Curated annotation (Swiss-Prot):
It comes from the Bacteria. GO terms for cellular component: ribonucleoprotein complex; ribosome. This is Large ribosomal subunit protein bL20. One of its GO terms (biological process) is translation. The keyword RNA-binding applies. Binds directly to 23S ribosomal RNA and is necessary for the in vitro assembly process of the 50S ribosomal subunit. It is not involved in the protein synthesizing functions of that subunit. One of its GO terms (molecular function) is structural constituent of ribosome. Pfam families: Ribosomal_L20. The lineage of its organism: Bacteria, Pseudomonadati, Pseudomonadota, Gammaproteobacteria, Lysobacterales. InterPro entries: Ribosomal_bL20, RIBOSOMAL_L20_CS, Ribosomal_protein_bL20_C. Belongs to the bacterial ribosomal protein bL20 family.
């Protein structure tokens, strides 16, 4: 059986990790063993961050909707309940965008929500 030398594969594997570690400081960029740990940790943080991003944006949208709703005399929960009763199905992302960029449009939505709550 022929002897298998793995120099090419090892170099390729090392190069892949060291390429991912570009921009890191000191040994985290230069030493394979340290760079591998740094890259694994960075990928873990990136994975967690992608999940947290969804939570953070949802809470930001809710905060913006709440602020705009209170300007129009409603709490967030009553505003959302009013929209539900009025049959208006806009998601929080769109509502937050309307609240920031179109105050008059949001005021009209708030009036519809108030009307649906009163009825």
């Amino acid at each position: 059986m022929a002897r298998v030398k793995r120099g090419v594969q090892a170099r390729r594997r090392h190069k892949k990790i060291l390429t991912l570690a570009k921009g890191y400081y000191n040994a985290r960029r230069k030493v394979f063993r340290v760079a591998k740990q740094a890259v694994i940790k960075a990928q873990q943080y990136a994975y967690i961050g992608r999940k947290q991003k969804k939570r953070n944006f949802r809470s930001l949208w809710i905060t913006r909707i709440n602020a705009a709703a209170r300007i129009n005399g409603l709490s967030y929960s009553r505003f959302m309940n009013g929209l539900l009763k009025a049959g208006i199905t806009l998601d929080r992302k769109v509502l937050a965008d309307i609240a920031v960029h179109d105050a008059a449009g949001f005021a009209a939505l708030a009036e519809k929500a108030k009307g649906a709550l009163a009825a």
